[in-house]
Amino acid sequence: IVNLVFFSPEDLNIIKNGPGERRRFMDLELCQLDQIYLTDLAGYNHIVNQRNRLLKDLYMNPSLKETLDIWDMQMLQYGTKIIKKRKDFVRDLNQVIQDIHHNLTGGIEHLEVVYEPSTEAEDFENVLKKNRERDIRMKMTSAGPHRDDLSFVVNGIYIRKYGSQGQQRTAALSLKLSEIYLVKE
């Protein structure tokens, strides 16, 4: 297996666009670094899709509601592992990216990547139970790793909304350079 890190203008989208871009970045990195993560992520995504299909089918067949517990237990099994691995990844990423960003900006800026899970691993089961009726009404799963996000904070400012284009570009470059380091390790 050859691990590659590619830098392109589209990498700015990780910083600027919605949470899906940032989850995709995180998942791609973790899949390169951890084969088990890839298996867990594939399993989790399959379970979420099945659960969402069930939530849509409940309208026509309310007796299926009993089977939600089965899907929830499987979501918990995969989801808690994903949340923990993402948390560890962001911790490791911060150890690298802060030095890189500090050097790129001549020490003027401090960059921090903040992992924003939709639920903590230890609360996931309670959140699924609490959100169940809402999920049924909305016909979709409202909490779990598929709703997580990352924020990029420079000197206390969330740069997705409030940072300059220069800050966003420097953060994207810092992120890609950090990838190189993490993949090499």
What are these regions (language model features)?
Residues I1-E21, F25-Y37, N94-D99, V127-E133:
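Nucleotide-state sensing region of NTPase/ATPase domains
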Residues Y59-E185:
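Conserved NTPase motor "head" modules and their coupling/switch loops across ABC/AAA+ ATPases, GTPases
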